[in-house]
Amino acid sequence: MSELRPTKPLEGVRFILPYGGEDYPEQLMDIPDPPKKLYGIGNPQVLTCGLSVIGARKATPYGRDVAFKFAKIASEHGVTIISGGALGCDSAAHRGCLEGESPTVVVLGGGCDRIYPESNRDLFQEVVDKGGAVISEHQWQFPPMPYTFRARNRIIAGLSRATLIVEAGLPSGTFSTADDALSSNREVLVVPGAITSPTSRGANRLLYQGATPIVDEETFEDVIFNLYGCLKVQDMRKKEIGETSLLFAALQAEQLSIDALMEKDDIGAPLREKRLAWLMVELAKLEHLSLIHISEPT
């Protein structure tokens, strides 16, 4: 693995975030042994409290389908998906997030100019092109090695408010990410699998040890709502309500004041142009769709 030749560099804006710097992710400061620097390509603003989705590299069709499905659901709720870019469940999670139209973050084991696996280069470029980021704690040309993949798992868990484990055998490197999540006081969610499936033995063991089970879409949406404050999409599709989708996405992602909404790049311009009248109309639409509830002033 250390003899991998450098791949064609990803195209995009490059950034370096030193520990304690203005744009360094605050949630990483709380983990044991936070990275001294983050090197990245893409948008550093997406390194917020997302959801990590991980699982087996040699995933079954079930594992890949579930990773894609739940990543897409979370993405449709405005949640950023964070994973390691590996084959199998990781790749499926990144693709599901892109399908749901939210940005996704790839945390590499080597430097950002040493793409691994090389077969995922086009996927990583799409991640960058669609507003996400590819990051590493190592310098650009640092080669991926077995120990660097174990070490990067703490970053995947640390950037996330919760970690969803889709498939994991015994033994499994996925357990290290679960351990990192628990040591950083993050939630561990697990999708159960057949007890006869080798790729689900580790996941089922984590459930036995007390991880939160995710058994269907409804339980997943409930957990997403509780962890991220996201509103349920129900039968509404963002594109069907025009400009209201901008407001809806902003409200899903975080609780914001009117002033804070105006500062957001994607929705600030419409707000500044149309001001309060537009805002009240759009909020009324969302309430009519039963997506939000506007309480009376006390």
Regions found by a protein language model. Give the residues of each.
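Glycine-biased, small-residue-rich flexible motifs in mid-sequence functional cores and linkers
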Residues: 3-295
